[in-house]
A protein has these predicted regions:
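Intrinsically disordered, low-complexity regulatory segments
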Residues: 3-28, 33-208
Length: 208
């Protein structure tokens, strides 16, 4: 049985907890600011969290390093590569930290030997439409040169933003410029503040 309490303006009742058999807060993640406090908890893979939960049940003395064998890092819905695993370890141990997420940009070759770059993932919370708009502005302002065409071919199977290059342009040069001048590479800050027993607390991985 779950106890109920008044909500923030006392107009209705709400459950004091939302019970589940795994740490749902860690799976879904959370972010926001209220009453001078902020939280930023990244989402995680459900299967990995359940495996770690089972390992914790079997061994209550399991360490955070051992839990990280099951949960190596966050799992973002928009994909991307996490850079800086030491910073993830710091976040899991202390509840605070920051790491970089880099969207994946791959090379492809079109007919006629014209090369293209394809953005296949973007950092968490980066707006794809605004990213494309930013690239278009950089091309227009000649801060990135060598791009012939830019189009969004994303569908239900995933993200696919095609950047068609002019002949003779070095793809790696354009890719480096995209990482430098846009938020295809972005930072995510750990701040695992949660309410525990009606008090704010910074949680480490094991405390979730």
């Amino acid at each position: 049985t779950v106890s109920y309490r008044n909500n923030y303006d006392e107009t209705e009742k709400e459950p004091t907890v939302l019970p589940s058999q795994y740490p749902n807060l860690l799976v879904n993640g959370a972010g926001g600011i209220a009453v001078g406090m902020a939280t930023s908890i990244p989402p995680h893979n459900l299967g990995e969290v359940i495996d770690a939960t089972n390992a914790f049940i079997e061994n209550q003395n399991i360490t955070i390093s051992q839990l990280m064998k099951y949960i190596p890092g966050p799992d973002f819905p928009t994909g991307g590569l996490i850079i800086g695993k030491d910073f993830i370890k710091q976040g899991y141990n202390k509840g605070r930290g920051s790491f970089k997420i880099r969207g994946e940009i791959e090379f492809e070759e079109k007919k006629g030997s014209r090369e293209i770059l394809v953005i296949k993932s973007i950092p968490y919370q980066v707006n794809k439409s605004l990213l494309i708009e930013k690239i278009a502005h950089l091309v227009r302002d000649k801060k990135i040169e060598g791009i012939r065409d830019l189009r969004d071919e994303s569908n239900r199977e995933g993200i696919r933003v095609v950047i068609e290059l002019r002949k003779g342009v070095e793809p790696e040069t354009v890719r480096r410029q995209l990482y430098k001048l846009t938020n295809i590479e972005n930072s995510f800050g750990f701040n695992t503040l949660a309410i525990v027993d009606n008090k704010p607390k910074i949680l480490n991985l094991k405390e979730f």
